[in-house]
């Protein structure tokens, strides 16, 4: 018997719990899974860690979760278009880890592929390097960027 991948909103809402890590696709306000974000809000889940390219513009996408106080931490590439997210980060109300976009995507891919991480030159000699392991391969230095898992602790 073939199982359907289609779920009702109620079934989806029931899956969200406090403290979960949720990866959300889209960028700025484009291709955001708006109904999924509505389901997260309707679930009442709090203390979430969000993996997203950005935090969207105010009143849209991921920003709705930040505005509702549901997000404790984000792993992202930037939040430059959202003054509320920036203010929450500056005040310490929201933890954030920033990654170059390609590195961010590669970390998610590595998690899904069961890999421990990726070696990259991106970020060497910058603030991105701080606190990360540098590995030498064939005389070249690389940053080890660990994979992003959906069971890893918040940053």
What are the language-model segments listed below?
Residues 2-101, 106:
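N-terminal active-site beta-alpha-beta segment that forms phosphate/nucleotide-binding
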Residues 83-149:
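An acidic, phosphate/nucleotide-engaging active-site surface
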Residues 150-155:
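Conserved small/polar residues in nucleotide/adenosyl-binding loops
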């Amino acid at each position: 018997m073939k199982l359907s991948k289609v779920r009702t909103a109620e079934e989806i809402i029931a899956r969200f719990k406090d403290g979960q890590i949720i990866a959300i696709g889209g960028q700025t306000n484009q291709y955001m899974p708006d109904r999924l974000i509505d389901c997260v809000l309707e679930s009442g889940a709090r203390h979430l860690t969000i993996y997203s390219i950005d935090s969207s513009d105010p009143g849209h996408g991921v920003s709705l979760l930040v505005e509702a106080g549901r997000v404790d931490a984000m792993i992202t590439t930037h939040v430059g278009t959202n003054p509320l997210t920036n203010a929450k980060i500056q005040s310490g109300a929201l933890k954030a880890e920033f990654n170059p976009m390609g590195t961010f995507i590669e970390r998610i891919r590595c998690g899904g592929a069961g890999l421990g991480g990726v070696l990259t030159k991106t970020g060497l000699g910058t603030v991105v390097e701080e606190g990360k392991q540098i590995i030498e391969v064939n005389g070249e230095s690389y940053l080890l960027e660990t994979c992003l898992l959906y069971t890893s602790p918040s940053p």
